[in-house]
Amino acid sequence: MSYYAFEGLIPVVHPTAFVHPSAVLIGDVIVGAGVYIGPLASLRGDYGRLIVQAGANIQDGCIMHGYCDTDTIVGENGHIGHGAILHGCVIGRDALVGMNSVIMDGAVIGEESIVAAMSFVKAGFSGEKRQLLMGTPARAVRSVSDDELHWKRLNTKEYQDLVGRCHASLHETQPLRQMEENRPRLQGTTDVTPKR
């Protein structure tokens, strides 16, 4: 793992969290229990404080950053999709930010909300609970349905389970030169399927 102290501040990572070895955590970063931080994620706490609360996940290639005297927060069980950028914002408890979305300074995403993939949430946006946000700039299009929230929670549970699976079995290795016969397929821990 790449952890860097900055001006006397050292990242804090709960022992039950999983941080991928290629992720980078700098300075004022606080990672809670059972959090998953994916490959190539960059959490730069060299200006503002970055807080990732219990059970949340920050997936591959995500960036977290913020201005001085601000907190960038991912709430409990927050779900941040691949390549998303969070800058000086607050993501509410049990909310999902879709892949490659950008959430700007001072924006607040409400609890149990979903930000669709590729959305741009403008600085200062103030969301409400359980909104579906989409577009560039993002706007609330409707409420998140019970089925959508259930789907989100199953996906988040997969990442929470992945924490333990990574602690138990992830290690650096050399590639095989050819595929073995009867190569097994990996299985998830829930019955979640892709949204279509």
Swiss-Prot record:
Chain intervals for the UniProt region annotation (Disordered): 173-196
Cited CDD domains: LbH_paaY_like
Keywords: Repeat, Transferase
Annotated GO MF terms: transferase activity
Single Gene Ontology BP annotation: carnitine metabolic process
Compositionally biased residues, Polar residues: 187-196
Key word Repeat present: yes
Pathway assigned in UniProt: Amine and polyamine metabolism; carnitine metabolism
Stored InterPro entries: CaiE, Hexapep, Transf_Hexapept/Carb_Anhydrase, Trimer_LpxA-like_sf
Family designation: Belongs to the transferase hexapeptide repeat family.
Function recorded in the entry: Overproduction of CaiE stimulates the activity of CaiB and CaiD.
HAMAP family, per database record: CaiE (MF_01525)
Entry protein name: Carnitine operon protein CaiE
